Amino acid sequence: MATVFERVKKVSVEQLGAEEKDVVLTASFADDLGADSLDQVELIMALETEFGTPETKFEIPDTDAEKLKTVQAVVDYLKSKGIKDS
C-alpha cells in the first residue's frame, strides 16, 4: 500500500534525480531538490500521469502548479483533489 507521499517521492526521485533521503515533506523542489523551472513542469506532468488513470485524466492547472513549491504542498493539493493512499 503506497501513500500519496510515497508516490510523490517516487516521481520526484525519478524526474529530478533527487536522493530518496532528500525528498521529505518540507523539501522545496527548487531550493532543496535542485529543480529548475523546466524540471518543475516535467514533474507536474509526471504527477498527472502517476495520479491519473486511462479512464480518468488527472490535470493540474498551471495556476495551481505555480503554487506547488514543496513536497508537502503537492501532497496536500492531491489530497484536496480526492487522491487517497492506495
Curated annotation (Swiss-Prot):
Disulfide bonds: none annotated. Pfam families: PP-binding (PF00550). The keyword Cell cycle does not apply. The keyword Transmembrane helix does not apply. GO terms for biological process: lipid A biosynthetic process. GO terms for cellular component: cytosol; membrane. Residues 2-82 form the Carrier domain. It is found in: Cytoplasm. Its main location: cytoplasm. One of its GO terms (molecular function) is acyl binding. NCBIfam families: acyl_carrier, PRK00982.1-2, PRK00982.1-4, PRK00982.1-5. Carrier of the growing fatty acid chain in fatty acid biosynthesis. Belongs to the acyl carrier protein (ACP) family. This is Acyl carrier protein.
